[in-house]
């Protein structure tokens, strides 16, 4: 064996694909982050980090399945317990209150104790209270259970942000973030139809028990396969570890608290929170009320709603995945992080608001679903830009930055169900959707204060 010369090493750093070429005479591989050439020796990058990305996708999917099942069961629960829209809006808001409350503490927990422990405990906690939703009897017990369920889900996304920071090359963070987001968005795609099928066969209460059991199983998988440091994983070889650590300065795996004094004086810190407040506010209007809206405003049956309510979320998945891929490609080729992330983030909200307004002017049910799909789907541009920016701005403090951002997003979630219910009850569904569309103006303005190319800390 002999060390690569400087030219060979620089070639390998510039074009990682060259390191994967299999040759018996001159095969490049990695040992302790050095590049060697040897005869009859082959090493290919293991790419286990993308299996971790798919696991993040699945856990995110389960988390949103656990949220959307209440929205789908809302008509049945309202009838069984005599609740009205405002009652259900308040119950939904209690979930988001608990969820928002744990965002910043969840980020601090993920940084202090690591994404493995924090993520596992969060999934177990929320799964227990998902199951306990089945035993709630009145609006106060429903509200209490959903509040505690929200507290359990609170730390998971900050934990995922830390995992992405530790497990992925800095040029892959946008694409990795799209796995996190699209797992969340797949829940409302499959959730309505699956929940309707389960409700029709075993009743709405068993739906919550089944999802609770699935969540506990996922907590075990996360704890087993995603250690704090990729170097501790038996599935990550030296080639992949060197790729993950390329251009990275060493940071401790378990670390001290974020510099909150510096963060609170940063305009970017507040701007990324404000734009995400608007982004999540709009999304949670869809999450909380889309099923009932389609049934009341456009006469969809329960079975038909279970199918068509998935279309906006499916569109969101497609746009989020594609935007994450193409934005990362553009940045890797030298495009400005500021323009790529900022333009995508603001354009997503603009298109969303315009399409949502057009949906209110459309009487045909299928055209309405089409415009709603474009509206929610365009937020894929914004979601992807938001999480990539949070990770870039925070670096080793990505858990705290993403927790702060998600905290404001879920303040939007606290307000959206109840405010939308009140407007819809008082003035009709069209007024509720127009008010939602108008909120986008604030989000667009906030985006132009975010500079993803300039880290806060």
Show the residue positions of the predicted features.
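Cytoplasmic helix-loop-helix junction between adjacent transmembrane helices
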Residues: 145-184
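Extracytoplasmic
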Residues: 51-85, 286-291
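Single conserved hydrophobic/aromatic residue that forms the stacking wall/gate
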Residues: 1-15
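Conserved MFS/SLC helix-loop-helix module at the cytosolic interface between two early adjacent transmembrane helices
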Residues: 102-137
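Structural signature of the two symmetry-related core transmembrane helices
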Residues: 117-131, 339-356
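Extracytoplasmic gate region of multi-pass secondary transporters
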Residues: 70-71, 266-321, 383, 387
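Helix-loop-helix hairpin linking two adjacent transmembrane segments in secondary transporters
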Residues: 184-226, 230-233
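Helix-breaking motifs and short loop linkers at transmembrane-helix boundaries and internal kinks
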Residues: 82, 114, 135-141, 169, ...
């Amino acid at each position: 064996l002999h060390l690569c010369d400087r030219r060979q090493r620089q070639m390998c750093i510039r074009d990682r694909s060259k390191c994967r070429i299999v040759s018996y005479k001159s095969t490049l591989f990695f040992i302790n982050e050095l590049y060697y050439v040897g005869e009859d020796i082959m090493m290919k990058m293991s790419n286990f980090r993308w299996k971790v990305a798919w696991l993040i996708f699945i856990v995110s999917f389960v988390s949103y399945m656990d949220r959307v099942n209440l929205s789908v069961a809302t008509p049945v629960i309202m009838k069984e317990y005599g609740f009205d829209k405002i009652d259900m809006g308040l119950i939904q808001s209690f979930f988001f209150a608990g969820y928002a409350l744990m965002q910043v503490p969840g980020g601090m927990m993920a940084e202090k104790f690591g994404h493995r422990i924090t993520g596992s405990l969060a999934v177990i906690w929320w799964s227990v209270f998902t199951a306990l939703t089945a035993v709630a009897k009145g609006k106060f017990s429903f509200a209490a259970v959903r509040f505690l369920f929200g507290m359990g889900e609170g730390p998971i996304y900050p934990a995922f942000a830390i995992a992405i920071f530790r497990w992925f090359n800095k040029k892959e963070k946008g694409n990795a973030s799209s796995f996190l987001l699209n797992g969340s968005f797949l829940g409302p795609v499959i959730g309505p139809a699956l929940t309707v099928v389960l409700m029709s066969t075993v009743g709405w209460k068993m739906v919550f028990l089944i999802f609770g059991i699935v969540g506990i199983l996922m907590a075990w998988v996360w704890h087993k396969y995603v250690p704090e440091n990729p170097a501790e994983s038996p599935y990550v070889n030296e080639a992949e570890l060197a790729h993950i650590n390329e251009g990275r300065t060493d940071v401790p795996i378990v670390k001290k608290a974020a510099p909150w004094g510096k963060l609170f004086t940063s305009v970017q810190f507040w701007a990324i929170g404000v734009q995400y407040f608007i982004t999540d506010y709009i999304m949670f209007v869809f999450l909380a009320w889309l099923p009932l809206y389609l049934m009341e405003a456009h006469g969809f049956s329960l079975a038909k709603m279970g199918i068509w309510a998935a279309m906006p979320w499916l569109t969101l998945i497609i746009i989020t995945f594609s935007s994450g891929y193409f934005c990362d490609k553009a940045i890797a080729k030298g495009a400005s992080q500021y323009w790529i992330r900022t333009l995508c983030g603001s354009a997503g909200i603009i298109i969303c608001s315009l399409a949502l307004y057009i949906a209110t002017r459309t009487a045909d049910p299928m055209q309405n679903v089409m415009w709603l799909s474009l509206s929610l789907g365009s937020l894929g541009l914004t979601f992807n830009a938001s999480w990539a920016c949070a990770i870039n701005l925070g670096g080793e403090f990505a858990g705290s930055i993403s927790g702060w951002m998600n905290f404001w997003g879920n303040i939007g979630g606290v307000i959206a169900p109840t405010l939308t219910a009140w407007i819809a009850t008082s003035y009709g569904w069209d007024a509720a959707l127009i008010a939602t569309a108008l909120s986008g103006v604030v989000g667009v303005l906030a985006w132009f204060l975010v500079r993803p190319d300039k880290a806060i800390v």
